[in-house]
């Protein structure tokens, strides 16, 4: 990384881009890219980038901004329309080519340098239109290595310090599906210039102000003309007082009142049609007489034409009710029911089809439908219901109780009459053993001829049932259960017996006794003393 910094030249300008995600400190290479840096710093000084957004984001590649419209299709440079093209300006006109040249030229040229390459993240470059020398105001930051941009886009700065992490956060924003626009774009609030190498740079005033001043002037003139016309139409009496020549103006309200009076008479009688036609005929020459007298002002016939449609909707509204009355008694009556009959027929056919479908499918359940209680609705359809009581059981409950008592008495009688239990079971007789062998060799077991094993289970016939087995024996019914009386628990003799049988051993006392026993055996061997001189004295005696 240090080698990369050694290759890049020393920056000569710096600024801080304040965003809603945090600050981004930028160092600019104004010596290597003077046109690009001047354009960026001048637009930042003018507040051109304030409240703009980063409208494009490609994760791991770039994040782009600098368009006031926020669409990616806007932006302008400080060199547009031949600005700064003098002989002493930074970009004279004789050095401009193509679309950059001329009084209507746009954008500015690319500035490439052999030591400025897009070889890592955090580098600042100018965005163009995909063609050479089409730079305007849009710029971008790299989010990774982008060698394909070297030689195509101008690199004029880099991110400095720990603010690179704020740029990384911007690069992690969510993007719309199938697009490159962030869901929640980050906004540039302002750009603060720290070091500006261009001493002659000053804040410019916005140009669209004179256009705004020039535009309203014709509109005001038009509005004044319209206002004058409206005054003539709506305030005719006042104008008549001021200008005595305009005599036909009072005739217009008279004409309007006549039309309204004629329309009121048309509602009351059927002869209104002839009166209306005559009133309209009279109205036309009156309207024609007004522009003839005042042929010079052209807007007057227009005003009359504007006036003329105003009473027409009133006449139409008042003419509609009699038309409806005529329609009720005239031929349109059968037309409406015809349309309704067609609709009714189609609706009836649809209803018949639905009814037929319901009959074929839901005919049986409709007949069997019964109202169910809340408890019955909780029972699932797959549940099996129990056997119902007999019809007379609820009315005569003593009958069932009597039957149960009779069954109990019969069972007791059967137990009393049961045969006694067999005390001793007869010994099982093996059919394979002969009678002579059972007498003399009862204790000996027979050896198998095949395996030579005594009492071989493989050669024994297990499927033969012994004769003494009796499955119908009822002797068990007379059996009685008898157990020895538990006296230990009642008189607490069990506890006393347990205390007597319990042996308590003290390990210290046991160890002491064992030690004494060992000592006694040792003394017995040595004659009662372990000393050699004592043993010798005892041997002499």
Curated annotation (Swiss-Prot):
Membrane-crossing residue ranges in chain numbering: none
Swiss-Prot/TrEMBL keywords: Cytoplasm, Isomerase, mRNA processing, mRNA splicing, Nucleus, Rotamase, Spliceosome
Residue ranges, annotated region (Disordered): 199-443, 513-541
PROSITE patterns given in the database record: CSA_PPIASE_1, CSA_PPIASE_2
Official protein name in the record: Peptidyl-prolyl isomerase cwc-27
Biological function: PPIases accelerate the folding of proteins. It catalyzes the cis-trans isomerization of proline imidic peptide bonds in oligopeptides. Involved in pre-mRNA splicing.
Gene3D superfamilies reported for this sequence: Cyclophilin-like
UniProt-annotated location(s): Cytoplasm; Nucleus
Entry EC number(s): 5.2.1.8
Main EC class the enzyme belongs to: isomerase
Ranges of biased composition (kind: Acidic residues): 432-442
Compositionally biased intervals (Basic and acidic residues): 279-307, 316-348, 361-374, 513-525, 532-541
Subunit-level organization: Associated with the spliceosome.
GO terms assigned for molecular function: peptidyl-prolyl cis-trans isomerase activity
Catalyzed reactions per annotation: [protein]-peptidylproline (omega=180) = [protein]-peptidylproline (omega=0)
Keyword Transcription regulation: no
Entry's Gene Ontology BP terms: mRNA processing; protein folding; RNA splicing
Main location: cytoplasm
Domain PPIase cyclophilin-type residue range list: 11-193
Family of the protein in this entry: Belongs to the cyclophilin-type PPIase family. CWC27 subfamily.
Domain of life: Eukaryota
Entry GO CC: catalytic step 2 spliceosome; cytoplasm
InterPro entries: Cyclophilin-like_dom_sf (IPR029000), Cyclophilin-type_PPIase_CS (IPR020892), Cyclophilin-type_PPIase_dom (IPR002130), Cyclophilin_A-like (IPR044666)
